[in-house]
């Protein structure tokens, strides 16, 4: 029997916690637990029992995600018209939910993205906000399900009265670096892979034929999200123990992180007047850049809203 290590979780000093923050905390703690050669037992400090943040985290499934018998199970909280608790999305769930009237995994993901956006925005009206958020959720889920090799990802999100919205998609898969290694991309290494991943036309499917590329992946999803964030908010991409942050004032940060899988956190602080036009302009610019590098053109799905 392996030795056991009790670890006390003390979050009592945290007064406010957005989805991006608690997702990162959860991944750090989970990776710590998984990488030890002894059994880690998480316990919640007594001083946390009266914390409003702990109440919120227990409600959204944070502790269940860590494997603690505390608070709601993942997927059991109903959420509200301002937030989506931690929810599991799997290929099997999507097929079971939508297969009666949809044909492909991409169709299922589109339906799920629209459903999540309706919850987040309290409306099904196809406003510019609705279109750009649906697009972003769809591309982030596609990235997770098509590249992680686990068939499962987790989503959580929140919106605020000032129009700000934050969307988190995370998985515990192989990570972007290992995924891109399958494409034999020139000059790829474990320091530059995130920079390559946000370039247009870079995908693990680069060396696949059209017949083999069953998901019609062309390597434009992260490229578009990166440029959307540079104009309208903030993007965090963490994968294969590295992270990249970009903000709408064009500031960028890079560094190391413990998580092997992938986290995509996109925050909208403002919205385009014409989402379709913005996406098309970004993709067109990307196609020109990709052509100069001999890479793929975008798929129809990558530029559709």
Describe the function of each predicted region.
Residues 84-124, 185-206, 225-227:
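Helix-loop-beta hinge of the Bergerat
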Residues 28, 60, 127-161, 222-229:
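Conserved ATP-binding N-box helix of the HATPase_c
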Residues 171:
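Acidic ATP/Mg2+-coordinating residue in the GHKL
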Residues 1, 67, 184, 188, ...:
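Flexible, glycine-/charge-rich segments associated with ATP-binding catalytic modules
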Residues 174:
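Glycine-rich G1-box
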Residues 16, 20, 114-138:
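Conserved short strand/loop->alpha-helix "switch" segment adjacent to the catalytic nucleotide/phosphoryl-transfer site
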Residues 1-67, 265-305:
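N-terminal assembly/transducer modules of large multi-domain enzymes
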Residues 163-167, 262:
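Short beta-strand element(s) in the Bergerat
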């Amino acid at each position: 029997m392996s030795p056991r290590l009790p670890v006390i979780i003390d979050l009592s000093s945290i007064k406010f916690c957005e989805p991006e923050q608690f997702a990162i905390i959860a991944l750090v703690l989970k990776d710590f637990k998984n990488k030890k050669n002894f059994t880690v037992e998480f316990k919640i400090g007594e001083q946390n029992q009266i914390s409003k943040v702990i109440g919120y985290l227990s409600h959204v499934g944070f502790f269940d995600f860590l494997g603690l018998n505390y608070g709601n199970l993942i997927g059991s909280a109903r959420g509200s018209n301002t937030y989506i608790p931690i929810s599991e999305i799997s290929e099997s769930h999507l097929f079971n939910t939508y297969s009666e009237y949809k044909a492909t995994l991409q169709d299922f993901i589109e339906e799920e993205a629209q459903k999540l956006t309706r919850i987040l925005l309290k409306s099904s009206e196809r406003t510019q906000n609705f279109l750009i958020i649906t697009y972003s959720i769809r591309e982030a889920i596609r990235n997770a399900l098509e590249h992680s090799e686990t068939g499962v990802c987790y989503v959580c999100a929140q919106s605020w009265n000032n129009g700000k919205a934050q969307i988190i998609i995370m998985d515990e898969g192989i990570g972007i670096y290992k995924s891109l290694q399958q494409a034999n991309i020139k000059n790829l290494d474990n320091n530059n892979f995130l920079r390559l991943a946000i370039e247009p036309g870079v995908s693990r499917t680069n060396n696949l034929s059209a017949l083999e590329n069953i998901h019609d992946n062309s390597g434009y999803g992260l490229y578009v999200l990166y440029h959307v964030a540079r104009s309208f908010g903030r993007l965090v991409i963490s994968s294969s123990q590295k992270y990249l942050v970009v903000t709408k004032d064009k500031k960028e940060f890079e560094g190391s992180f413990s998580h092997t899988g992938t986290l995509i956190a996109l925050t909208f602080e403002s919205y385009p007047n014409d989402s379709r036009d913005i996406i098309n302009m970004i993709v067109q610019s990307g196609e020109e850049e990709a052509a100069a590098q001999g890479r793929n053109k975008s798929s129809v799905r990558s530029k559709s809203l």
